[in-house]
């Protein structure tokens, strides 16, 4: 008999979760997920080892090409304040009163969907000097930020919209200054084209002039109506937070939409793109691969190990052979996204050596697909992943991200300890099969214009 403990047994295909039986002891006090209303969930996680607590609300909604720029600016405007604290000065003062609590608002991607998030982190009620009810204060701020924005005559404050539109314009212009980021985004634009996964997270520079207080309010209303809402609480009274959340939702008409299904771009003949920039000292190479829409993509655990072996660690093939042995690049890494079926390899090389680096990268990938993989290199690469999972328990934000990632992928919730079990169970054949599923699709090269190359070096310019 194990007190206060529930048994959960999940059965899944071998390919997805590495094991036929997933057996997990899940203590109620450590992790519990409840549905409060259609499309509204709350997940409570233990934070016993921390003196701080955290409340986060995630709104996952379908991305729209027509309103992508409004959504990007909206996140910036919401972070400035809400009805009870209508400007940044009042909001900063209120957070300072709560022993220096931290508030953040962010817009991110979940495959073809978008996620608007607001989080607040501060000390627990136990440590309040005067016995204040900090949980209610935190919930009031983070929910106020999302559900009670500061409005002027029913629309967003024109001055706040003007300021944050200019801020977003500067952010988009700055993309070109980071050539690595610029190359990756240019490659993704060619790769995804007009597909839903290709909608720009930061919006479009030419459409910022169309952002108005009224258009922001229309996008805000659409998000509240269609979003699936997940609240994640750590170290606070879940019941009090849930009660306040439901009261905030009482006056909102809701029609939550299902999550977008995983998608992948179709396999196509390889396309090469080259862009020349005067005076560039380090060329950038971004190579994108697609699974072509497999109905049963590899599990996240398999992809993590596969990317670590290929180019995601200091013991990977690309790092050891392309960077160290052949000295063909300053950096060379790989990453994969299960929801869109894309694998990316990007590197920084000397101008003029892009083709040589590309050939070496493809040779290493081919070697992993069809050549031998030793257990030693698997274990070396796996060791870093296991260490990073151990570190998750040292951060409230990292733990929350771990569990919300599982929610976005439609997986059962399991702790990092079981993630280590799944990672340790990944086999050589599973890594090979995962890499074999990718087909080379797009190569984007940002290099120096002939006759203008700099001296070369590690600088990202």
Regions found by a protein language model. Give the residues of each.
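An aromatic/glycine/proline-enriched structural segment found at the starts
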Residues: 197, 201-207, 222-294, 453-461
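M16 family metallopeptidases and their MPP-like homologs
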Residues: 43-45, 51-71, 88-144, 148, ...
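N- or domain-start disorder-to-order transition segments that initiate the globular core
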Residues: 27-54
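Short, positively charged and aromatic/hydrophobic N-terminal segments
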Residues: 6, 10-13, 17-27
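Short, polar/flexible loop-turn hinges at active-site or ligand-entry regions and domain interfaces
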Residues: 81-84, 126-129, 148-157
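A conserved active-site cap/scaffold subdomain adjacent to cofactor or substrate pockets
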Residues: 295, 300-312
């Amino acid at each position: 008999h194990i007190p206060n403990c529930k048994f959960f047994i999940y059965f899944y295909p071998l390919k997805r979760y590495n094991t036929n039986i997933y057996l997990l002891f899940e203590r109620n006090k450590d992790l519990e997920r409840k549905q409060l209303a259609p499309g509204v969930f709350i997940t409570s996680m233990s934070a016993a080892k921390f003196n701080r607590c955290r409340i986060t609300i995630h709104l996952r909604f379908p991305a729209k090409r027509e309103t992508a720029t409004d959504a990007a600016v909206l996140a910036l405007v919401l972070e400035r304040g809400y009805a009870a604290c209508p400007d940044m000065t009042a909001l900063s003062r209120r957070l300072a009163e709560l022993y220096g609590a931290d508030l953040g608002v962010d817009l991110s991607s979940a495959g073809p969907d978008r996620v608007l998030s607001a989080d607040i982190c501060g000390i627990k009620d136990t440590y309040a000097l005067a016995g204040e009810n900090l949980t209610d204060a935190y919930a009031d701020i983070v929910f106020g930020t999302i559900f009670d924005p500061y409005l002027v005559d029913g629309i967003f404050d024109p001055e706040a919209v003007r300021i944050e539109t200019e801020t977003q314009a500067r952010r988009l212009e700055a993309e070109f200054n980071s050539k690595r980021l610029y190359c990756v985004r240019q490659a993704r634009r060619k790769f995804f084209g007009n597909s839903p996964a290709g909608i720009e997270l930061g919006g479009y520079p030419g459409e910022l002039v169309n952002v108005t207080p009224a258009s922001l309010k229309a996008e805000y209303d659409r998000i509240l109506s269609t979003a699936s809402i997940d609240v994640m609480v750590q170290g606070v009274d879940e019941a009090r937070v849930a009660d306040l959340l439901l009261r905030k939702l009482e006056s909102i008409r809701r029609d939550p939409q299902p999550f977008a299904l995983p998608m992948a771009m179709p396999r196509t003949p390889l396309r090469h793109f080259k862009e020349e920039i005067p005076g560039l000292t380090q060329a950038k190479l971004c190579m994108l691969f697609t699974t072509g829409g497999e109905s049963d993509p590899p599990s996240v655990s398999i992809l993590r190990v596969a990317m670590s072996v290929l180019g995601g660690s200091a013991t990977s093939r690309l790092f050891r052979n392309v960077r160290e042995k052949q000295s063909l690049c300053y950096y060379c890494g790989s990453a994969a996204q299960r929801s869109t079926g894309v694998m990316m390899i990007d590197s920084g090389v000397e101008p003029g050596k892009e083709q040589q680096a590309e050939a070496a990268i493809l040779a290493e990938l081919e070697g992993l697909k069809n050549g031998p993989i030793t257990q030693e290199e698997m274990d070396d690469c796996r060791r870093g992943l296991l260490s990073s999972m151990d570190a998750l328990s040292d951060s409230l934000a990292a733990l929350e991200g771990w569990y919300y990632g599982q929610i976005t992928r439609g997986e059962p919730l399991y702790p990092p300890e079981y993630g280590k079990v799944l990672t340790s169970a990944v086999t050589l054949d599973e890594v090979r099969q995962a890499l074999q599923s990718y087909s080379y699709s797009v190569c984007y090269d940002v290099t120096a214009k002939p006759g203008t190359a700099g001296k070369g070096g590690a600088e990202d310019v």
